[in-house]
């Protein structure tokens, strides 16, 4: 599930990490009747070639259970077909050249089971409430005479079957094996790659199985450090896991989730209130624009984007670095991953001090840089925590708790008041609308149609979908068919209205503000004594001594959790049985004395799949288990019946929405559960025993692949052994034959290369000439090598693209922003200092404007300054005095033109288009005057008498004061001087002309121009 809102925070703070995916579309020929698939063996259109593609399959299974771009499936076959199309699209986007790794969630560590249990119990509770509300709405519709289509039975009515050990997950594993065989045998883009399938019978979460593969391969001989990885998944913690690998060339592929200003809208029609899966183009039908078949078949695809980890590393290098401190990027990244654990993770409850929507990450980073890292110490060393430094860091964070709680109370108070005002306004508007409708009903007229033609026209022109297409000339059979279609359309409309009302009802019910069912805040974190009230309400502490004892144990377990998560992210599970035994977390200021804690873990072993189902599923999902297990969940006399309460408390814990509440379920006692399961395990069938077993990853390659010969030779040596014995005999993989992949292979049970691979998906054809061979794949040993990226040999580090200018600063921290809204992020700009006394920016612009106006006002009298305001709206010169005549210099002369004031704009005052427009307004007298003036200037420009402006006269007088007295020249001397100046000017002009002609002749002969 990951960290809520973390991805939104990431793309807002580090926007350049996001790259839009460029997709090719299949080519349609013969008018769209035939579609030519995309050749994935061709270069990637995104300009970046990937070696390995990793699929977190649960991020594919869930969207295919509840798709947004099509109606929900009703059978497993429809789900599988949707998944195959989904994987095809992802494969074409990325086009891996070496490996495709599909990882399905297996049995999770006990620390994750608590969250899975709460989520599945909550889903069952919400489904029961939704079913009850839907039944009431159906009865209401029936009383109103609105017909609804009957309910459709579905195999996928319960999404809780997406859990290891269920029949669905076993069927899915075989369906994916069939899909892999089909693609490797037929698709040219798959021909040279290896495919690894880690299904639900392999213990571990899907994303962590992927990280184990990368981690175990990277430090072995033969591994290429420049391998380009791409990981698909929806969980936000995939970003943390990718950073933890310290692999440079890493991207995450995911759907575009957030559209600015369009959250919660259907992306097909852009309307709110429904998903794209439920969209039937109602908006078009309401306006009478009925969709034809071709329009209805068009599917709008959701866009995708890459999150480039190497860009994120550059951002963090700038954002986490302390000026003057020694730079170690990998350790800074490790510390960043660790501090993000405090704002949310899948294994520990949320700390009440820190909310990511309240700028918690900015606060943590600010404390890290300004108050902690100034000591030049780190919080982590790979997977190990320096608890002394962690305590110092979190103590500095805890100093802001009072300010955070005060600000949070102010924000909640404002939201509550605003909602009450909005609710009162909406109620008044609804009352006014009802009164208006009532008045129209009493004052309306009865419209009588004179003919059947008018009846037909009114029916066909109705904007609603609920109309009857009857033609008076059609026969009775066609009329009956169209009547039946219209009735069916009416039922679909009613069903759509039912879904809309149900969704709105459930949304309002789950909103504490709208429903008015918000719980009273008994802790009151903004008032004195909040710590004592917190432990009294949440942990049932009855005395000061008991509160202190509980606090110490909570701090111990929470610190154990931090250490467990850090090890899990960097080196895998350190204990399968450890879990946090409380529903609530401590405050940041409670984490004291961490250095004295003795923290140790025992590895243990994972649950069996059926035991995990008993631990996480509610009794409403007992159908997902074998028959012999169901009574343990549904029978009141079961020894573990107390694990499955019919109802349970949901603590809103100060939150607004019900989904944010904490499900206070009893924790499962492992010993009691395993003892109860052992009593019924003997009744399992062979197929159920297989579903309840821990299996291995499977490797698939084309028989012509270099690994194909290795698999065949291994199979020939183990043909006479049992399946259990064959799995124990392993062969080391030569990385030279496998594009740098290390590990071991073992023979799989049965035929590793059947000549015909039978279809396991209904309606799909068998693979008749199979060329794919498979084997068991086992990871190599986890060699913990150097995590310092720049020390890895042969590593090609991408060119730097991020600078300080690209960083965004949040300004004030959330709790420091007083009672105002938080200021938007601002771009950090490098400060440039101007010389003393100079002006720039806005001051320079205003000064320039004043200078232009002064110059215009100081023009000679013949310019005839207009005292009327200019008629040029939307310009900076609005209501300023402008000249009626503006000089334009052409051919060493002056042409006076008179533009209309409405055409004067501040841009391109002398452009040819503007001059042409002005010439249209000239009079014959003004044109003749301009010609005379121009001809007189051509005869002797020196005879032109210029009128000096006051500013020019003032400047000239000032200059005269500073000039030393000189002997006054006679008239003859002035004429001689003038002649000499004219001759010098003529000579200079002649030299320039000759120089230009020489260059022109030189370039014409092909001589290259001189370079600077």
Curated annotation (Swiss-Prot):
GO cellular component: nucleus
A Gene Ontology BP annotation from the UniProt entry: nuclear-transcribed mRNA catabolic process
Zinc fingers (CCHC-type), renumbered ranges: 264-281
InterPro entries: 5_3_exoribonuclease, Xrn1_helical, Xrn1_N, Xrn2/3/4, Znf_CCHC, Znf_CCHC_sf
Primary location: nucleus
EC number: 3.1.13.-
Keyword Zinc in record: yes
Basic residues compositional bias, start-end: 990-1002
Region (Disordered): 411-439, 888-976, 990-1012
SMART domains the UniProt entry points to: ZnF_C2HC
Compartments, as annotated in UniProt: Nucleus
Tissue: Expressed in roots, leaves, stems and flowers.
Compositionally biased region (Polar residues): 904-914
Highest taxon, organism lineage: Eukaryota
Keywords: Exonuclease, Hydrolase, Metal-binding, mRNA processing, Nuclease, Nucleus, rRNA processing, Zinc, Zinc-finger
UniProt keyword annotation of Hydrolase present: yes
CDD domains assigned to the protein according to its UniProt record, in alphabetical order: PIN_XRN1-2-like (cd18673)
Basic and acidic residues: compositionally biased ranges: 415-433, 918-928, 950-962
GO molecular function: 5'-3' RNA exonuclease activity; RNA binding; zinc ion binding
EC main group: hydrolase
Family of this protein: Belongs to the 5'-3' exonuclease family. XRN2/RAT1 subfamily.
Main function: Possesses 5'->3' exoribonuclease activity. Acts as an endogenous post-transcriptional gene silencing (PTGS) suppressor. Degrades miRNA-derived loops, excised during miRNA maturation in the nucleus. Involved in pre-rRNA processing. Involved in the primary exonucleolytic shortening of the 5' external transcribed spacer (5'ETS), required for endonucleolytic processing at site P by the U3 snoRNP complex. Involved with XRN3 in the 5'-end processing of 5.8S and 25S rRNAs. Contributes with XRN3 to polyadenylation-dependent nuclear RNA surveillance.
Protein name: 5'-3' exoribonuclease 2
């Amino acid at each position: 599930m990951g960290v809520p809102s973390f991805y939104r925070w990431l793309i807002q703070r580090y926007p350049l990490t996001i790259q839009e995916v460029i997709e090719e579309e299949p080519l349609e020929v013969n008018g769209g009747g035939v579609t030519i698939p995309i050749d994935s063996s061709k270069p990637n259109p995104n300009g970046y070639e990937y070696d390995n593609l990793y699929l977190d399959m649960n991020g594919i299974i869930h969207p295919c259970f509840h798709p947004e771009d099509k109606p929900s499936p009703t059978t497993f076959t429809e789900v599988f077909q949707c998944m195959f199309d989904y994987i095809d699209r992802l494969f074409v986007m990325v086009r891996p050249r070496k490996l495709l790794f599909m990882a399905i969630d297996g049995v999770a560590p006990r620390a994750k089971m608590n969250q899975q249990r709460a989520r599945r119990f909550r889903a069952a509770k919400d489904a029961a409430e939704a079913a009850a509300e839907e039944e009431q709405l159906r009865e209401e519709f029936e009383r109103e005479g609105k017909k609804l289509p009957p309910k459709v039975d579905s195999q996928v009515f319960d999404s809780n079957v997406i859990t290891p050990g269920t029949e669905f997950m076993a069927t899915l594993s075989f369906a994916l094996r069939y899909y892999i065989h089909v693609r490797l045998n037929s698709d040219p883009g798959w021909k040279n790659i290896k495919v690894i399938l880690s299904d639900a019978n392999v213990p571990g979460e899907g994303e962590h199985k992927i990280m184990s593969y990368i981690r175990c391969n990277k430090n072995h001989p033969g591994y290429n450090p420049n391998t380009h990885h791409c990981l698909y998944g929806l969980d936000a913690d995939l970003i943390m896991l990718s950073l933890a690998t310290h692999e440079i060339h890493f991207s995450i592929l995911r759907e575009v989730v957030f559209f600015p200003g369009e959250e919660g809208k259907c992306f097909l029609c852009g309307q709110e209130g429904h998903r794209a899966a439920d969209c039937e183009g109602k908006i078009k039908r309401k306006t009478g624009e009925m969709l034809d078949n071709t329009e209805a078949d068009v599917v709008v695809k959701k866009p995708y984007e890459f999150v480039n980890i190497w860009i994120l590393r550059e951002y963090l290098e700038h954002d986490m670095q302390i000026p003057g401190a020694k730079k170690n990027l990998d350790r800074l990244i490790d510390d960043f991953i660790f501090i993000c654990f405090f704002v949310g993770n899948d294994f520990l409850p949320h700390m009440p001090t820190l909310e990511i929507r309240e700028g918690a990450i900015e606060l943590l980073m600010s404390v890290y840089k300004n108050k902690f890292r100034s000591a030049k110490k780190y919080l982590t060393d790979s997977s190990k925590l320096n608890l002394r430094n962690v305590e110092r860091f979190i103590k500095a964070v805890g100093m802001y708790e009072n300010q955070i709680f005060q600000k949070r109370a102010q924000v909640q108070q404002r939201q509550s008041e605003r909602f009450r005002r909005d609710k009162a306004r909406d109620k008044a508007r609804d009352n006014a609308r009802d009164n208006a409708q009532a008045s129209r009903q009493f004052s309306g007229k009865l419209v009588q149609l004179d003919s059947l033609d008018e009846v037909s026209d009114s029916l066909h022109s109705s904007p609603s979908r609920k109309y009857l297409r009857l033609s008076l000339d059609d026969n009775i059979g066609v009329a009956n068919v169209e009547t039946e279609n219209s009735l069916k359309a009416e039922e679909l409309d009613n069903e759509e209205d039912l879904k809309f009302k149900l969704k709105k009802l459930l949304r309002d019910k789950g909103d504490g503000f709208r429903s008015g069912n918000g719980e009273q805040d008994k802790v009151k974190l903004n008032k004195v004594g909040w710590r004592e009230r917190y432990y009294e309400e949440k942990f049932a502490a009855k005395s000061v001594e008991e509160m202190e004892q509980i606090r110490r144990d909570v701090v111990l377990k929470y610190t154990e959790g931090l250490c467990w998560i850090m090890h899990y992210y960097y080196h895998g599970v350190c204990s399968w049985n450890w879990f946090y035994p409380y529903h609530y977390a401590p405050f940041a200021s409670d984490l004291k004395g961490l250095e004295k804690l003795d923290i140790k873990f025992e590895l243990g072993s994972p649950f069996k799949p059926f035991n995990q189902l008993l631990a996480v599923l509610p009794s409403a999902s007992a159908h997902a288990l074998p028959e012999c297990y169901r009574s343990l969940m549904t029978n009141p006399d079961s020894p573990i019946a107390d694990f499955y309460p019919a109802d349970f408390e949901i603590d809103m814990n100060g939150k607004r929405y019900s989904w944010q509440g904490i499900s206070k379920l009893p924790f499962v006692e492992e010993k009691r559960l395993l003892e109860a399961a052992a009593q019924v395990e003997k009744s399992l069938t062979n197929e159920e025993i297989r579903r309840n077993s821990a299996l291995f990853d499977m490797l698939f390659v084309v028989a012509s692949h270099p690994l194909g010969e290795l698999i065949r030779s291994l199979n020939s040596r183990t043909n006479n052994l049992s399946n259990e014995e064959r799995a124990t005999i392993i062969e080391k993989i030569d990385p030279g034959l496998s594009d740098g992949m290390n590990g071991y292979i073992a023979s799989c049970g049965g035929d590793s290369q059947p000549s015909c691979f039978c279809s396991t998906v209904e309606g799909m054809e068998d693979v008749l000439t199979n060329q794919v061979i498979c084997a068991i794949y086992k990871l190599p040993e986890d060699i913990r090598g150097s995590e310092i990226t720049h020390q890895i040999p042969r590593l090609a580090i991408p060119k730097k693209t991020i600078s300080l200018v690209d960083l965004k600063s949040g300004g004030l921290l959330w709790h420091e922003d007083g009672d105002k809204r938080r200021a938007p992020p601002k771009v950090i700009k490098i400060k440039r200092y101007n010389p003393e006394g100079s002006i720039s920016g806005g001051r320079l612009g205003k000064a320039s404007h004043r200078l232009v106006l002064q110059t215009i006002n100081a023009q000679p009298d013949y310019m005839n300054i207009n005292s009327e305001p200019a008629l040029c709206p939307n310009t900076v010169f609005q209501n300023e005095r402008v000249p009626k005549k503006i000089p334009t210099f052409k051919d060493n002369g002056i042409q006076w033109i008179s533009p209309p004031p409405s055409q004067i704009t501040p841009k391109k005052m002398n452009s040819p288009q503007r001059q042409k427009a002005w010439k249209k307004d000239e009079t014959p007298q003004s044109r003749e005057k301009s010609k005379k003036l121009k001809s007189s200037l051509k005869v002797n420009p020196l005879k032109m008498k210029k009128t000096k402006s006051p500013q020019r006269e003032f400047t000239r007088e000032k200059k005269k004061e500073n000039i030393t007295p000189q002997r006054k020249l006679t008239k003859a001397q002035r004429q001689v001087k003038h002649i000499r100046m004219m001759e010098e000017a003529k000579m200079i002009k002649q030299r320039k002309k000759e120089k230009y002609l020489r260059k022109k002749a030189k370039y014409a002969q092909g001589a290259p121009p001189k370079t600077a």
